[in-house]
């Protein structure tokens, strides 16, 4: 089947690219550096635990609460890495091949344009999803090893994280069918940065004025509909938190996580429906555009 053939070629091409190899090596080095730093910090803490023992928090609970913050910090880093890799790898998914003249050779053969787009989308989706899951479980495993904390909703967190990657992939697939590679990458990057920027502005205005601006909330909602990655990240951060009844035990408060980067509320079901529509429809629009595009 031509679709699976294109998918296999896309996977092989991604693996052969120096960019992907460099990202894998850098990710492994980052994971190693993180493991060493956390080990040093935890060992230093345990060797000086007499200070903590004189307080109301035991060393074990202190480590668990530290694990919560480390989970959010490192999975946020995994979210950034997978998102940036998505933009860099897929901004030229279609446009770069058109510019290089590759499709002029492939398309006359018995391979439909729809199979080319969907096959390339599927290949990139597979490799990006595997990379995201690898980072997710690698960081969680290190943190669990050193602190003993494992999120009770880890698989829900992974699910929303993967949805964010696929949503961004849908956006770059659509853009690659309409505009040149550099323009597509720039648009995706600006939108990706714009979503959390809107959240930060909304948070700052709310803190300063003590009043929630409806206009800013509407703008943030529109941006989250255009690119739902930031809203999905907030859902991921919620799933990384411990159960509500564990917060007092760990000497934590939900107020600690009401920030522009984290959330104490799950993803709204309506947003999940929109994201599913987004992930499926944007590549289909790219197919329709590619059907009419000159090669």
Where do the protein language model's features map onto the residues?
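Aromatic- and glycine-rich beta-strand/loop motifs that create alpha-glucan
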Residues: 1-28
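Cytosolic juxtamembrane amphipathic/interface segments immediately preceding
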Residues: 5-13, 115, 259-263
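Helix-capping/transition residues at the boundaries of transmembrane alpha-helices
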Residues: 13, 95, 106-108, 168, ...
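Pore- or pathway-lining transmembrane helices of multi-pass membrane proteins that form conduits
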Residues: 20-28, 181-199, 217-221
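Secretory targeting signals
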Residues: 31-91, 117-188, 220
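Terminal transmembrane helical anchor/hairpin motif
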Residues: 37-68, 192-288
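Transmembrane alpha-helical segments in integral membrane proteins
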Residues: 77-98, 276-292
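Helix-loop-helix units of permease transmembrane domains in multi-pass membrane transporters
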Residues: 92-125
């Amino acid at each position: 089947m031509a679709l699976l053939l294109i998918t296999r070629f896309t996977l092989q091409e991604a693996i052969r690219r120096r960019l992907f190899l460099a990202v894998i090596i850098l990710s492994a080095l980052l994971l190693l550096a993180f493991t060493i730093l956390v080990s040093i910090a935890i060992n230093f803490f345990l060797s000086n635990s007499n200070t903590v023992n004189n307080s109301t928090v035991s060393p074990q609970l202190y480590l668990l609460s530290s694990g919560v913050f480390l989970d959010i910090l490192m999975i946020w880093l995994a979210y950034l890495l997978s998102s940036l890799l998505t933009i860099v790898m897929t901004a030229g998914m279609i446009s770069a091949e058109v510019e290089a003249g590759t499709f002029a050779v492939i398309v006359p053969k018995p391979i439909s344009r729809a199979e080319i787009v969907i096959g390339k989308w599927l290949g990139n989706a597979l490799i990006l999803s595997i990379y995201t899951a690898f980072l997710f479980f690698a960081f969680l495993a290190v943190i669990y090893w050193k602190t003993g904390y494992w999120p009770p909703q880890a698989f829900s967190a992974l699910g929303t994280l993967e949805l964010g990657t696929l949503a961004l992939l849908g956006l770059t697939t659509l853009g690659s069918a309409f505009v040149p590679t550099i323009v597509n990458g720039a648009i995706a990057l600006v939108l990706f940065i714009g979503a959390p920027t809107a959240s930060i502005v909304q948070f700052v205005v709310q803190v300063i004025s003590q009043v929630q601006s409806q206009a800013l909330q509407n703008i943030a909602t529109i941006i989250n509909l255009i690119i739902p990655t930031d809203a999905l990240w907030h859902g991921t951060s919620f799933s990384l938190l411990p159960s509500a009844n564990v917060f007092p035990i760990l000497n934590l408060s939900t107020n600690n996580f009401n920030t522009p980067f984290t959330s104490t509320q799950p993803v709204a079901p309506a947003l999940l429906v929109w994201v599913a529509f987004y992930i499926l429809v944007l590549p289909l629009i790219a197919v329709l555009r590619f059907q009419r595009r000159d090669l």
